[in-house]
Swiss-Prot record:
The keyword Protein biosynthesis applies. GO terms for cellular component: cytoplasm. This is Peptide chain release factor 1. Belongs to the prokaryotic/mitochondrial release factor family. Keywords: Cytoplasm, Methylation, Protein biosynthesis. Peptide chain release factor 1 directs the termination of translation in response to the peptide chain termination codons UAG and UAA. It is found in: Cytoplasm. The keyword DNA-binding does not apply. One of its GO terms (molecular function) is translation release factor activity, codon specific. PROSITE patterns: RF_PROK_I (PS00745). Methylated by PrmC. Methylation increases the termination efficiency of RF1.
């Protein structure tokens, strides 16, 4: 282990001990906001320090095993213990390097999932509905909550555009690499000749801002229009101007919400989506700059990039960024995304480790 990494781990172990003292003091709960911040910091540090403790124990075990090598009667046991200890050290060293990687401050946030039908007309809209169902079922497996914020249904089912809010611990960290172009190859329900068509959708995953105040939005930059809602919502909703359209004039971003009967709630939802989009635009600009420097593919922020193909005749799904193909399309469409998402996280961590190595850290 590099001395710089060991020094950092020693510092974190000392900080954890300091936090334990602060949290156990009589004054700890006088300021509940500070108490929550300290508790959150402790929860982040504890697993890293525990790994470091296991690493130091493995080092001690290896030192003890080397002493046994000097005793002819204990050499075989010593070699066995040393081999096991060195294997533990190698594994823990990798775990510790990953644990020390820079954390994305958005990882624990809720998110807005935006799916837009692209090329392919009605078939693309149907696929947008399939993608929403796929992500919703994955969210259910994680015990997350899915709320439809805005939707524009197509005539044959599915969506021309749909925005959902996904609420749950670590939601953004799991799904943040899903942004990009998703392509489907299958025989559409409207196809009478049995020909395979190719359609596409664009997915955007945006972290929810903690508060609207966290994103600077000048009210003078907004044009807010109200109109009568259409589509699902019942007769009552069509009698009032409950739907809201907000245009951010400097960027041209437009958000519509009409799924609630309350104009006030539709406006609040639209403002939340607008804040997430503005925040996400800044995030993608940073990611794009980093990707240009590191030649990164994962998390590059490029929405125009085709990231995945779903081939129904072959029952396969291919993620083009990491050249991963799984012949379990049915399971994936039912929300079994863990294998795909885990592979993307590992690739991202490998890129981060390579970047740190280049910087000499």
């Amino acid at each position: 282990m590099k001395q710089s990494i060991r020094d950092k781990l020693e510092h974190l172990a000392g900080r954890l001990a300091e936090l334990d003292r602060e949290l156990s003091s009589e004054d700890a709960t006088r300021d509940m906001n500070a108490f929550r911040d300290l508790s959150r910091e402790r929860a982040e540090l504890e697993p890293v320090v525990a790994l470091y403790g296991a690493y130091r124990q493995a080092e001690q075990d290896c030192a003890t095993a080397r002493e046994l090598l000097d005793d002819p009667e204990m050499q075989e046991l010593g070699r066995s213990e040393l081999e096991a200890g060195e294997a533990r050290i190698a594994a823990l060293d990798g775990d510790l390097q990953r644990a020390l990687l820079p954390r994305d401050p958005n990882d624990e946030r809720n998110l807005f999932l935006e799916i837009r039908a692209g090329t392919g007309g009605d078939e693309a809209a149907l696929f947008a509905g399939d993608l929403l169902r796929m992500y919703s079922r994955y969210a259910e497996r994680q015990r997350w909550r899915v709320e439809i914020v805005s939707s524009n249904p197509s005539d044959l089912g599915g969506y021309k555009e749909v925005i959902a809010r996904i609420v749950g611990a670590g939601a953004y960290s799991r799904l943040k690499f899903e942004s990009g172009g998703h392509r489907v190859q299958r025989i559409p329900v409207t196809e009478t000749q049995g020909r395979i068509h190719t359609s596409a959708c664009t997915v955007a995953v945006m972290p929810e801002a903690d508060e609207l105040a966290a994103v600077e939005i000048n009210p003078a930059d907004l044009r807010i229009d109200t109109f009568r809602a259409s589509g699902a919502g019942g007769q009552h909703i069509n009698k009032t101007d409950s739907a809201v359209r907000i245009t951010h004039l400097p960027t041209g971003l437009v958000v519509e919400c009409q799924d609630d009967r309350s104009q006030h709630r539709n406006k609040a939802q639209a403002m939340a989506v607008l804040a997430a989009r503005l925040n996400d635009a800044q995030l993608r600009a940073r990611q794009s700059a980093e990707a240009a420097t590191r030649r990164s593919l994962i998390g590059s922020g490029d929405r125009s990039e085709r990231i995945r193909t779903y081939n129904f005749p072959q029952g396969r799904v291919t993620d083009h960024r990491i050249n991963l193909t799984l012949y379990k399309l049915d399971a994936v469409m039912q929300g079994e995304l863990d294998e795909l998402l885990a592979a993307l996280v590992l690739e991202h961590q490998a890129e981060q480790l390579a970047a740190l190595a280049e910087e000499g850290l």
